[in-house]
Design a protein with these regions (language model features):
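Histidine/cysteine-enriched polar flanking segments
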Residues: 1-423
Length: 423
């Protein structure tokens, strides 16, 4: 008949890449023409098109926030008040998950991880739901999922779900280059048992397989099983920096903590008290901390665990010592030989552009000012970052979590397009 005709084909990705699905879909097209009556049609054109399902992409602390999520509980008014002030002053939206929805589960970071998918014609956020399935488990599906907000989860059928499956144990670095290899979307970071351990807790294989299968943010496994809760966000985070590198790695450091306390003692402040104002049963002097040989031995062990991870991160992210800032944080070790923060863990912070929401450490005061806050503020001011200290002592720290554990941030996507990566 002649003339022109156009036909549109649409392909919808219904599954993310995973261990058993590479994410590639092949479609073969053939244009046939009739020949003589009674004979098969013959091809005049054929082509094959391969589609790749868009991967799920995580967003690091260096990307701009869009909105912040926290829970409201019967006992976290003080925390919520501090978070509300920080988020409003930073110019972002705060979304509060109320108690009828969270049912007393305050650990917003542990239940979900925000990411996104991207294509030449559309992009939208996708939340990854943790297999921890606490009382917050209905929140991502009932509240977040929508026409332009995706949802994905992985269920561990044949594996035991542990604390390491909570997403305080799932982070992502800013973009890095290692030995000439670019990671323009950064690298995923998870915590697992020590490589040679015969026993220990790990992130479930079904979640690890999913993360590896996305291919665009090749994961790094750190050793986090030395912690009682076992999350990487208990000893590390990233903050933006105004230089070519673009970020700094912050690490908890007992050595830096003891250096600070010894300095206070040498300057005549040995009787200054930790946890001042939190009750006589909490208070302890600098002299008492420094004379506690058991605490010192515990922190030597913790420092060796963090040093192992420091070396892994330097190697896998292409970092020098100048790219790392050590924060003065002490730990103590429980009966199970696993560590928890001795005072509110300042590395477990929320990063909102140049504003940091940091657990208030209740350190010893010198001339009316907390020495730990003064040191932290000094370290961050050099990067142009502003510190807000949030009281999470009773409502989070005492329950073995801090500010980062109790909050979550949805961020803007990368400007870099994943399909420009060599895969």
């Amino acid at each position: 008949l002649g003339g022109n005709a156009e036909m549109n084909f649409y392909v919808e990705g219904l599954r993310f890449p995973d261990k058993d699905f590479e994410g590639l879909i092949s479609i073969s097209l053939s244009l046939l023409e009739p020949s003589s009556q009674g004979f098969p049609e013959t091809p005049i054109f054929t082509d094959r098109v391969v589609f790749r399902v868009a991967p799920w992409i995580m967003t690091p602390n260096t990307l701009n926030p869009v909105e912040v999520f926290v829970c409201s509980t019967s006992d976290n008014y003080q925390f919520l008040k501090g978070m509300r002030r920080l988020v409003e002053n930073s110019g972002y939206k705060l979304k509060v998950c109320h108690e009828y929805m969270n049912r007393g589960d305050r650990w917003m970071q542990d239940e979900i991880e925000f990411g996104y998918i991207d294509s030449p014609h559309q992009r939208f956020p996708v939340v990854l739901d943790s297999p921890r399935d606490g009382e917050l488990q209905d929140f991502p599906y009932d509240v977040l999922l929508g026409p332009d907000f995706g949802y994905v989860t992985r269920t561990a059928y044949d594996e035991e779900v542990s604390s390491l499956d909570s997403f305080g144990n799932l982070e992502v670095s800013p973009p890095v280059t290692i030995n000439g290899k670019n990671y323009p979307l950064g690298r995923i970071i998870i915590g697992v048992a020590f490589p040679t351990a015969t026993k220990g807790r790990n992130m479930t294989k079904v979640v690890q397989d999913f993360l590896w299968a996305q291919k665009v943010q090749e994961p790094i496994a750190l050793f986090s099983d030395w912690l009682l809760v076992g999350h990487v966000d208990e000893f590390m985070t990233f903050v933006p920096a105004p230089d070519k590198k673009g970020f700094r790695l912050l690490l908890a450091s007992p050595d830096a903590g003891y250096k600070l306390f010894r300095g206070l003692q040498n300057d005549g402040h040995g009787q200054a008290k930790m946890f001042d104002g939190l009750g006589a049963e909490e208070e302890i002097t600098v002299d008492e901390i420094l004379s506690d040989d058991k605490l010192r031995a515990e922190n030597n062990y913790v420092q060796s665990c963090i040093d192992w991870n420091r070396d892994v991160l330097k190697r896998e992210l292409g970092l020098d010592d100048d790219d790392i800032i050590d924060l003065p944080i002490l730990f103590h070790v429980t009966e199970e030989n696993r560590a928890v923060a001795y005072y509110p863990d300042m590395v477990n912070m929320i990063v909102l552009g140049k504003n940091l929401g940091i657990p208030k450490p209740f350190g010893p005061k010198v001339d009316g000012r907390c020495a730990l806050e003064a040191e932290m503020t000094s370290l961050m001011e050099g990067l142009g970052l502003s510190c807000t200290y949030i009281d999470d002592f009773a409502s989070y720290h005492k329950l073995l979590g801090e500010v980062h554990c109790g909050s979550n941030v949805r961020r803007e996507p990368f400007s870099f397009k994943w399909w420009n990566l060599e895969m």
